[in-house]
């Protein structure tokens, strides 16, 4: 391996999740930005003192910094105009909030509209919008049986928070609000859309048991071979065998320890879903949210497959412990999102329509029947993305191992702070990174073998 | 001791068993068939003499002898030199330091470089602390901030100048110390071979059972590691470690101890001289769990060193009785084969980097 290649390994692999997100804000610059209001970039902070040194100079610096920070917050224009005020009424009975006539861009991704044209918000959506100041919270009071006799009781933010009935609900809200504020489209799995899309075909179309039979016969046929096999650790082994290359040795070594092969492609994914036998006694972690990357073409009723799925875990909750492997397995088994490792589907949205099922029928058929325009291939800026960077094979292999296959996001709550961990199934057993000395046999054949990638 | 050899020449064989080289077989030349058969029959993959493994009183597995240590290092990077960072270079380094070798070898100075850098870093920290004190003093005196900044710049420049000067002037420090008398051999031209190559228990097992290159007795190794009457959980833990080790080795990874980064194993492509380790492996049982702090701590340490954390869950596929039976019958490889490796990749997820 040349140095240039090594350099490319270093550059190619360490790009994504580097720890460079720790940017503190310098509020004195921020104060200037608020006035300009058009700029969005935050400047880097200056040098930091490690401890108070008791001098006036330091105290003054600190004071001015604090002053500008609070000043920025206080002096910017706050509140909402009466004209755009949206009232949301909390209905205790349904545990939902009702907006009589909803308007605003939040309706693109939140709430459900009933046949009377009223928009119904889930509790977490309601609290999130109240916190943002988008809607004003009111308590729906029914005097007597007369529905019409509403008295508007304005709620405070504290009142709204008091509506959470359990820690789990509050934890889910924290994650929801966090991702929402970062621009993601987040939909709770408790509140499925009108038309659910799945990657897996409906159960009636489940492939028959014949494939199972085939597997049995297949493994049966393989046995005779093993009868004459003298294992590597047997004393006679080296009398009977001659290895003329290292790959042969590796081949032999890899016979001993079995490994779990995880699904790599569409067929394997579907097969695992159908045939996977899971321990029913294992705790079933709830997949709390489906998350989409920000996109303008999002449709509330037919959102399609999410980009990520999120499981919420509160570290401080004595009732919850970090998942064991079996619990992870059960989560992986239930995942149903846009599997980003499927190369053949990575191109655009419309390709996914051919492989997914909505309301139990192929998505394309569903769309034709309901006269929905097919998903548009990403336009404009995204065309650049289609020409995804291609890497040399050995780098692509490592990248694949690092990102794994099926994955989900575990959001960990620690004292109200949310952090995210991506857990992915990986598979070191299916790809070999044998090194074969090039000079030894002089054939190029060997070299290609060592580069063999099963991704 | 060989001079500095290019890595691709020196580390030709990735495993301690070298493949045999058979002569070309030419179809129309019967003589070549005879020659080929002869070569096939007489050749063998086995080492002419197995490498003796010593088990110390402290339960450490060591290999002595310069050739043997070098052989294990060059054929798959097994073991760690007890007096070195990883490759057993103590002998060469010491000879070099004491200038016993007239040829004067360069290239075994890795540890020296590390030492020098540490010294420089320490020096810098001392300088910085003294400047911090000075700045505090200035502030107390009510000197303007801009002036202090000016001073700081001046100080940094001075520091840089001095560093450059120092780099130019540093020669070799005086070679011989008082305690060196004990390690110089009688003839005065070499040092006593006191360094040993230490193997992890799983490495010793791998080199005894899977690839028979060590002259050692597996039951004795195990008795030393686990005690004479090991409990089943102990046996299982060792099996898990071994299964994971063998699994990664057999797929071409160079597996070394991960103690430096608080995990069980480190995975290198090809080996430490060629690449940094890319993965850190933590071996776990499927029903094992820790509190979140444990996972996040490991992931932080590993992530800080630009490696990916792999949670290798090694599951037992058969009943515990079967494992115990195989173990007592000393059919260790079959016992290890009862375990299956499952892998998860644990990685921090940054929302901002996954938005588009």
Curated annotation (Swiss-Prot), chain A:
Coiled coil: none annotated. Non-catalytic subunit of the tRNA-splicing endonuclease complex, a complex responsible for identification and cleavage of the splice sites in pre-tRNA. It cleaves pre-tRNA at the 5' and 3' splice sites to release the intron. The products are an intron and two tRNA half-molecules bearing 2',3' cyclic phosphate and 5'-OH termini. There are no conserved sequences at the splice sites, but the intron is invariably located at the same site in the gene, placing the splice sites an invariant distance from the constant structural features of the tRNA body. One of its GO terms (biological process) is tRNA-type intron splice site recognition and cleavage. Residues 434-447 have a biased composition (Polar residues). This is tRNA-splicing endonuclease subunit SEN54. The keyword tRNA processing applies. Residues 366-390, 434-455 are annotated as: Disordered. tRNA splicing endonuclease is a heterotetramer composed of SEN2, SEN15, SEN34 and SEN54. Interacts directly with SEN2. It holds the Pfam family tRNA_int_end_N2. InterPro entries: tRNA_splic_suSen54, tRNA_splic_suSen54_N. Belongs to the SEN54 family. The lineage of its organism: Eukaryota, Fungi, Dikarya, Ascomycota, Saccharomycotina. Keywords: tRNA processing. It comes from the Eukaryota. One of its GO terms (molecular function) is tRNA-intron endonuclease activity.
Swiss-Prot record, chain B:
InterPro entries: tRNA_endonuc-like_dom_sf (IPR011856), tRNA_intron_Endo_cat-like_sf (IPR036167), tRNA_intron_Endonuc_cat-like (IPR006677), tRNA_splic (IPR006676), tRNA_splic_SEN2 (IPR016589). One of its GO terms (biological process) is tRNA-type intron splice site recognition and cleavage. Transmembrane segments: none annotated. Gene3D superfamilies: 3.40.1350.10. The active site is at residues 268, 276, 307. GO terms for cellular component: cytoplasm; mitochondrial outer membrane; tRNA-intron endonuclease complex. Keywords: Lyase, tRNA processing. It catalyses: pretRNA = a 3'-half-tRNA molecule with a 5'-OH end + a 5'-half-tRNA molecule with a 2',3'-cyclic phosphate end + an intron with a 2',3'-cyclic phosphate and a 5'-hydroxyl terminus. Pfam families: tRNA_int_endo. One of its GO terms (molecular function) is tRNA-intron endonuclease activity. CDD domains: tRNA-intron_lyase_C. SUPFAM superfamilies: tRNA-intron endonuclease catalytic domain-like. Its EC number is 4.6.1.16. It is an enzyme of class 4 (lyase). Heterotetramer composed of SEN2, SEN15, SEN34 and SEN54. Interacts directly with SEN54. Belongs to the tRNA-intron endonuclease family. Constitutes one of the two catalytic subunit of the tRNA-splicing endonuclease complex, a complex responsible for identification and cleavage of the splice sites in pre-tRNA. It cleaves pre-tRNA at the 5'- and 3'-splice sites to release the intron. The products are an intron and two tRNA half-molecules bearing 2',3'-cyclic phosphate and 5'-OH termini. There are no conserved sequences at the splice sites, but the intron is invariably located at the same site in the gene, placing the splice sites an invariant distance from the constant structural features of the tRNA body. This is tRNA-splicing endonuclease subunit SEN2. It comes from Eremothecium gossypii (strain ATCC 10895 / CBS 109.51 / FGSC 9923 / NRRL Y-1056).
